[in-house]
Amino acid sequence: MALILTFMAPACASANETSVNWFMKGYTLYYEEKFSDSLDAYNKALELNPKDSEAWNNKGIDQGLLGKYDDALSSFETAVALNDSYAEAWFNMGVIYDIKGDYPTAVQAYKRATEVDPSYHKAFVARNVDTDLLMGRSLSCACQDQLALV
């Protein structure tokens, strides 16, 4: 039994390193603005480690930048299903709902981001902007003061 465990552990570590390597490749390609290639790398990372909430979030970012908004939402939803306290994924979900013009749902996503991380100023500002839009008002003074934080 010990012999089997000895052989299994290195195999698991190797698969994990490969997942991390694909993740880092996706990250690098994203910063080179090669979003399609970055998306491919995140897909490969997720084949090896489908429970990586960061890879799901980053995949969603690439999908959003490529105009695949429904796919992006699905990726962000998977990220928060794996890690409900992932404020950035909640924020990114709100951004996509904003792009789609679904401000009430965007407000809920931003609200969740600020519940998870009260210091997440971008989500706080975006929530206030959308709330003002929904209420048919111009930006409130409090919200205008926060815009510098974005």
Tell where the protein language model's regions lie, with residue ranges:
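Terminal, low-structured helical/coil segments at or just beyond the last alpha-helical repeat
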Residues: 12, 19, 121-150
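N-terminal leader/linker segments that initiate helical-solenoid repeat arrays
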Residues: 12-33
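Helix-start (N-cap) detector for alpha-helical repeat units in TPR-like alpha-solenoids
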Residues: 19-20, 53-54, 87-88, 121-122
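C-terminal segment of classical bacterial N-terminal signal peptides
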Residues: 5-12
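Structural signature of tandem alpha-helical TPR/SEL1-like repeats
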Residues: 31-44, 65-78, 100-112, 134-143
